[in-house]
Amino acid sequence: QAWVKWAWLEELGSGLIVLSGADQGALGAALLAGDEARAETLAARLAGLFPQRFYIELQRAGLPSHEAHVRAAVPLAARLGLPVVATHPVQFLEADDYDAHEARVCIAEGETLANPRRIKRFTPEQHFKTAAQMAELFADVPSAIANTVAIARRCSLTLVLGKPQLPDFPTPIMADGKPQPMDAFFRELS
């Protein structure tokens, strides 16, 4: 599981838009464990670090934890005056790709599809959804869809296909006053 130090968020979080991680994040785990006090503390801390940029994330992809999380997260967001956002944990392109995805998962885990005790972490619903499908999934929480659209607009960018667009990554300055070439720098690091 990924993690980030609070100090990093405090130091480097300027301009970030932060989602809570749905049922898989620390806030979601607290809600699913019934620890509303911890969930409220986490949400308040994140909202303080990221004013107008922290969203409680909701997902509905057919896992039991998703609906339990939504039932706990929406009231928490309302109590704290925080926005919710709808996202979808996509694992494959189309619904018909589910069986192939499960076969790949079994290969990676050394399992067989026929094993009735195999832990199933994915559902057939984890394909790309259309805007209409997402709106239907969250018809009872329309603000979650509206916030998804608002975040997408805030994050708009233009990519040129076939041309890598890498972040500016400063390298150490060499004796001649020029930055060290990236390939040489990364070769030293490896």
For each predicted feature, which ranges?
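Phosphodiester-processing cores and adjacent nucleic acid-binding clamps
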Residues: Q1-S190
